[in-house]
Swiss-Prot record:
UniProt entry tagged with the keyword Amino-acid biosynthesis: no
Assembly: Homodimer.
Stored Gene3D superfamilies: 3.90.20.20, Head domain of nucleotide exchange factor GrpE (2.30.22.10)
Chain positions covered by the region annotation Disordered: 1-22
Keywords: Chaperone, Cytoplasm, Stress response
Originating gene: grpE
Name of the protein in question: Protein GrpE
Length: 187
């Protein structure tokens, strides 16, 4: 009888241990799932933080790159005036030669300074017309060049760091229209 009681006690102990083992296994599984979820969330937060940091760096870079845009745009009429003054003055007139040389030097210094800040002129004379960089002011028939070629530049365009600041104002070629026969030729 004592053996039976021992066997019953052992069976009960084994059943209790098995129940406790199942409970512990379930508990470990739940904790592992929670740990995996926490690690996943941690990785997502780190990735989001990295994306925010990268966007902020790009915004600062763009701000630095294009901070001069308004200022450079305000300087363009001054460059145009200096160039127009040189175009309208005669290089052979001795009475204005010192003034002309001063304007040329000033313009060169101005252009060199603007180049250092990535402001570049667009002078498309003889190039194919591009609506992205040019503004057609007129069309002119020409048999000498391909249609859609820039014949004349009224005003240079400018770009800052590759971004268009002002389009070049141009005259664009078009194919000559066929000659209409005169009344005498028709008869």
């Amino acid at each position: 009888m004592a053996d039976e009681q021992n066997l019953d006690a052992q069976a009960q102990d084994q059943a209790a241990e098995a129940g406790a083992g199942d409970e512990l296994t379930t508990r470990v599984q739940v904790l592992e799932e929670q740990l995996a979820a926490a690690q996943d969330q941690s990785l997502r937060v780190a990735a989001d933080l990295q994306n925010v940091r990268r966007r902020a760096e790009q915004d600062v870079e763009k701000a630095h790159k294009f901070a001069l845009e308004k200022f450079a745009g305000d300087l363009l009429p001054i460059i145009d005036s200096l160039e127009r003054g040189l175009d309208l003055s005669s290089p052979d007139d001795e009475s204005i030669r010192p003034m002309r040389e001063g304007i040329e030097l000033t313009l060169k210094m101005f252009q060199d300074t603007l180049k250092r800040y990535q402001l570049e002129a667009i002078d498309p004379h003889g190039q194919p017309f591009s609506a992205d960089q040019h503004q057609a002011m007129a069309m002119q028939e020409s048999a000498d060049v391909e249609p859609n070629t820039v014949l004349k530049v009224f005003q240079k365009g400018y770009q800052l760091n590759g971004r268009l600041l002002r389009p070049a104002m141009v005259v664009v070629s078009k194919a000559p229209s066929p000659a209409t026969p005169s009344i005498n030729e028709q008869a």
